[in-house]
């Protein structure tokens, strides 16, 4: 992230705002697509309700820009990559990684290139980054106001962890997705977690978790936790896990939230088992994609690792599907009768609204 310039002038404390739900987007980093889906051809996508095209430049850098050519509006996703630029399929105008038109071909051998290039021949681009197997785009201001979260366990080349990426489409608002981790009350009704008690925690001092320093200094860190007292392992693999000696009495969830998502660290009886990155692709109104990357600590031999992958990876993916089913029937900005157990959800909403207020414009 050192190559991404932050807009330091805009990073300052703002009023927290009301604890209401919002369908608006916070200024933050969002996922455009999986890295392995962007190869040597332009890819059509929609972000923030905006038609976009993604492609890789000469250096392999991911570029995301407006999809329709500034000339006559042709679809650049139907074009191709030529000399490190994206070439329009209609008149072969070429745009570089910054969105500037750098070449307009002539009409015959005598006139090989038209000059000068029209001043308005430019494609608006989004700030991009690439990490954790995702292409990210910044939303809300010309320059990023906070960095990507630092998660060494989630780096795809970290051989100490097993990684599982998955995604679900949903019709709910982004806030509903990113606040879900902080809702302790749904653990039993939705996920059948056999809990006898839970404790909600809020953290103001980031220094116990050095990886969040850059987020915290930008005012973009939301620290929280839930400690569940659990009777036994849950789900269809409970019997197998107990047979392997994987019993537990405490499930400790630590959350390093940021405006566009969350990093959850899961420990059982104090032993960290995996980290989960939750992030979102805002597609258009009424359509978003929740992404999750689970990084599971490698322990023991093949059987133990396979069990952990199923228990912490595949079962978590299945559990996420239960949440999505609920979300798809929710009113995105509904509700309002809160209990004391909604404390973390409401605190996160206030944090999130502060970053909604930092959005410079919708474009």
Curated annotation (Swiss-Prot):
Changing residue 88 to A: Loss of oxygenase activity. Its cofactor is [2Fe-2S] cluster; Fe cation; FMN. Disruption phenotype: Cells lacking this gene lose the ability to produce pyrrolnitrin and accumulate APRN. GO terms for biological process: antibiotic biosynthetic process; cholesterol metabolic process. [2Fe-2S] cluster binds at residues 69, 71, 88, 91. It catalyses: aminopyrrolnitrin + NADPH + 2 O2 + H(+) = pyrrolnitrin + NADP(+) + 2 H2O. Changing residue 269 to A: Shows much higher activity toward the intermediate 4-hydroxylaminobenzylamine (pHABA) than pABA. Keywords: 2Fe-2S, Antibiotic biosynthesis, Flavoprotein, FMN, Iron, Iron-sulfur, Metal-binding, NADP, Oxidoreductase. Binds 1 [2Fe-2S] cluster per subunit. Binds 1 Fe cation per subunit. Pfam families: KshA_C, Rieske. Its EC number is 1.14.13.-. The record marks 183, 323 as: Important for catalysis. GO terms for molecular function: 2 iron, 2 sulfur cluster binding; metal ion binding; oxidoreductase activity. Pathway: Antibiotic biosynthesis. Residues 29-137 form the Rieske domain. Involved in the biosynthesis of the antifungal antibiotic pyrrolnitrin (PRN). Catalyzes the oxidation of the amino group of aminopyrrolnitrin (APRN) to a nitro group to form PRN. It has high substrate specificity toward physiological substrate aminopyrrolnitrin, p-aminobenzylamine (pABA), p-aminobenzyl alcohol, and p-aminophenyl alanine. Homodimer. This is Aminopyrrolnitrin oxygenase PrnD. It comes from Pseudomonas fluorescens. The gene is prnD.
